[in-house]
Amino acid sequence: MNDYNHYFHFPREEWRKLEVSKDQILTAEELEEIRGLNDRISLQDISEIYLPLIKLIAIQYHEAIFIHGEKMEYLKKKESRAPFIIALAGSVAVGKSTTARVFKLMLDRWFSKTRQVELVTTDGFLYPNKVLEERGIMDKKGFPESYDRDRFAKFLTDLKANKEDVEIPLYSHFTYDVLDETRVIHNPDIVIIEGINVLQADQHESLFPSDFFDFSVYMDANESDIKKWYLERFFMLRETAFQDESSYFHPYTKISKQEAETFALGVWDTINGVNLKENIEKTKYRADLVLHKGTDHLISDIYLRK
């Protein structure tokens, strides 16, 4: 399915011509600090793609604030607006985490830090490994059934109910498991929620996560490119983070490169690739905006819902 009929299509060359002040641009040092492993996002992308997008999000944010104010005045109520929630979805290894960090830094810059912007990843809403093992679904980690959807729904409900302090579970990619500790966000204005599952919908639930989102983005690329990036990232991690004996994946530094490649390909072909085709990719057309990356990691096309 390639249903972009209800989207405006902007090739990169057209999108980059949208007018926006360059005052909000990041420095090379700031970008380097937030760039993910094997993510080749550049200052050119920041200037040509993300600045116009941040302005668009700011327009949506101000519109939401205005409409809420008008409604409260009409209803003679004095309730502040719930946080503006931005969802960011896409496959493993497509660059979601870096993009989410870019969003946060640029929104902080755009609003001159007069708005509290928080970043949340849905990894913390996975069931702990112990639970996944007990249920026999450790090999389905990242699939819809591996997430504590009730906990995620409560988190979203608390946000939209203007609860003053909202608790967020934390996840470690080092130990490959949910941590015991949590963090609390206090009265945020804008919340960016990043994860492969944020646009998924369970037909048996009364509420869909998308019911809570004010703006949603899907990071897209051809599967062959994502698979290649996944393998490149795996081998980079094998030479760095996996070398620590406490890492969940440390054993894969002790086998040959060919054996490690066989393992990584197996993970893609039986888990990540399957999850992409069966669960993640089909959520693309639920997004308000789709960013499509080319083989070179650069965003080539932008699709904005009409």
From Swiss-Prot:
It is found in: Cytoplasm. The keyword Ligase does not apply. GO terms for cellular component: cytoplasm. PANTHER family: URIDINE KINASE. Pfam families: PRK. Keywords: ATP-binding, Coenzyme A biosynthesis, Cytoplasm, Kinase, Nucleotide-binding, Transferase. InterPro entries: P-loop_NTPase, PanK, PRK/URK. Its EC number is 2.7.1.33. It comes from the Bacteria. It is an enzyme of class 2 (transferase). Pathway: Cofactor biosynthesis; coenzyme A biosynthesis; CoA from (R)-pantothenate: step 1/5. One of its GO terms (biological process) is coenzyme A biosynthetic process. Coiled coil: none annotated. This is Pantothenate kinase. Signal peptide: none annotated. It catalyses: (R)-pantothenate + ATP = (R)-4'-phosphopantothenate + ADP + H(+). Belongs to the prokaryotic pantothenate kinase family. ATP binds at residues 90-97. One of its GO terms (molecular function) is ATP binding. The gene is coaA.
